[in-house]
Amino acid sequence: MESKLKKLVEFKELSNLYIDLSEDILKNLIFDLSIKDKQNQLLFINCIENSISSLADHIHTSFSNQIESINHLNFKYKWVELSKLETIKNVIQKELDNDGMIEMIEDSKKRILSINNNNLISSNKENDLKKFSLILNKYKTFNELLRKILEEC
């Protein structure tokens, strides 16, 4: 006897829930380099990644007949696959570029996980409230633009 998992939350709702969580976490970040704050920074990034991944899954449902399954991919490569769709290619490609939102997320995560070496002279800028707010704002703009495009299609 096979049992099927019941879908409790739609991808779109899940994406919104993760954004709400990331907004709450951002309010409590203080960027003091403490372990607790670094964990909260990672939690913020993780929520953004999960939201982006859920949004990709939501969009994939609209184009499932034009593109293969993306369920096995991480958040970035889901968007790489979705960028092959002519309808939304330009919007997605902008965020995959070096100065795009997805690169900013990956860079921020690397900075959180990197071990500081005081013997090296480097110009690496630490994560800060401005950068995390920018990531969140870019994502919200990206999200709204994609939803408007999908509504028009």
Locate each region found by the language model.
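Short charge-dense sequence patches
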Residues: M1-L8, H58, T87-N98
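Short acidic alpha-helical/loop segments enriched in Asp/Glu that coordinate divalent cations
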Residues: F31-S34, H58-F75
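Acidic, Ser/Thr/Gly/Pro-rich intrinsically disordered interaction regions
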Residues: I67, L73-C153
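Short, hydrophobic, well-ordered secondary-structure elements
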Residues: N40-T61
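Charged alpha-helical initiation segments
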Residues: M1-Q39
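Amphipathic, well-ordered alpha-helical segments in soluble domains
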Residues: L17-I25, C47, S54, K138, ...
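Alpha-helical initiation/capping and key positions within long helical/coiled-coil segments
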Residues: L14, L43, K131-L134
